[in-house]
Amino acid sequence: MLDRNASVDEGLAPAGATPTLDDLPRRLADFDTLGEALDYAARGVRGVNFHDARGNLAEAYPFARMRDDALAHARRFIGLGIAPGDRVALIAETGPDFAACFFGAVYAGAWPVPLPLPTSFGGRDAYVDQLSIQLDSCDPALFLFPAELADMARAAAAKRKIDARAWESFAALAQSDAELPSASPDDIAYLQYSSGSTRFPHGVAVTHRQLLQNLHGHGFGLQVVETDRVISWLPWYHDMGLVGCLLSPVAMQMTVDYLKTEDFARRPLAWLDMITRNPGTSVSYSPTFGYDICSRRMSSQTRAEDRFDLSRWRIAGNGADMIRPDVMQAFVDSFAEAGFEASAFCPSYGLAEATLAVSLMPPGEGIRLELVEENELSGGEPDDEERPRRYRAVVNCGKPVAGMHIEIRGASDEILPERGIGKVYVRGTSVMHSYFRDEESTRACLSADGWLDTGDMGYMSKGYIFIVGRAKDMIIINGRNHWPQDIEWAVEQLPGFKSGDIAAFAITGPSGEETPAVLVHCRVSDPEERGKLRDDIRERVRAITGITPVVELVPPRTLPRTSSGKLSRTKARHLYLSGEIQPYDIAA
């Protein structure tokens, strides 16, 4: 078992990296403002480290240097006329430029707004459109970006005549000698766009108090120890990457090692190499698909223990997407021989509208499941006793973090009893202030007494929260509810498929009835084999829903994803119905 009081052999870390240990007393985000948190962290020797595609150290960036750069940038912002409350849009590239500009905006009293990097799907025009929509939403006084994205960034900014500059151009500006404004806990600290919000973006306004209360609860729940070091490949434009793996380490004075998201996508095992080289205990989070990719990259000829040592991985966080028990078990099977312990898994539940974390599994408890009868999940009446019962494994997402409260409500807004499945509502000190300049959407999900409708479905059991799916994704057929992930997971059991290859949603049939539609990435070129595959999928789905579905085989990499890498069923449905997704032609 892991010895939490073990000493740290800093010799394992790359030469020049910021250290794991520090004489500065640890504080768990007990600050009034985010600027105060960086001021304190800068008094120590810890910091962040940026690594190349192979996981080798490219640049160490101590918190002290980050603060110096941020203060200089704050004076540049003021010199440009940026005032408290103005927005500063930033392309969230994993590197010192973004970090310094983000905190510089905070010191200047402005609201930094992280915007996404381009993805490998969608193309230039789609990315420019996405940036344009988010720039229109946040209405920034300034837009900063890496030089290599200048063409696309300027094209997006030109539509609104926004002052747009590359990092280097901004850093060359003179600094104002004006006094920096003082912040209060209830001032807005930043805007965070919720995952998937491209066509109708929702900028979540988060105050200093809300952020730091959530980080305190998160750190307390993780039982942070002195030897902890964060390893991350998560993008900074997503709440789990920004809040969990940048702002949280600053507020809790933890050293971090970063691998760029695009480098993880190309070489996912570099993530595990970095954990292996970590001289302390590792705290590292990933959505389910990150663990899945690593398991799949291990060949049958490769022995995990010959390359990796994962015995010091204390917190293997799971979040940002539905947690797949089969994927987590496959990861354990692949890496147990390298010292990985299943008890390190730490499922969680959260959303940008709650700053980050709503619930967290206590460290050491690992993944715990409950088998729930399909009929309970669908809200239907008991099945015919002669019909075989089907069950789904639902993952325990832990207990509410400090300061957070959860209620499960029924269709009439009544509070449901223990194990009653309904809509998940949360209230607490870190629930968002509002959606930026969107009172209607704010009122639709946030009540006057502070309860947030998360849009998720779940139930409580013995103080733990279990999430079963998104309410808006539910497929209703003949009055019976079906979860799209149940359909997708069933199809994935056929040979040749992986997570993210299938999107299930409802469409309206010729007679006005709802019908399940299933889009599937197809890697088979033979027409006869495609026809057989379609028929096999159709039978799988019919066995679950009782209805013959529409099955469409589409080219690989067709199905859209959100900025955080999750499958976007809503966008897939829109693209399919608009004709932008072109299925393969298959004879009936």
Give the residues covered by each predicted segment:
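AMP-binding/adenylate-forming catalytic core of the ANL superfamily
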Residues: 276, 284, 295, 428, ...
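Conserved AMP-binding/adenylation subdomain of ANL enzymes
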Residues: 212-229, 239-282, 297-303
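ANL superfamily adenylate-forming
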Residues: 55, 120-124, 128-134, 139-186, ...
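Conserved AMP-binding/adenylate-forming
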Residues: 314-316, 323-464, 472-474
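Conserved AMP-binding/adenylate-forming core of the ANL superfamily
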Residues: 49-103, 120-127, 180-182, 203-212
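Conserved pre-ATP/AMP-binding loop-to-beta segment of ANL
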Residues: 46, 175-193, 199-200, 210, ...
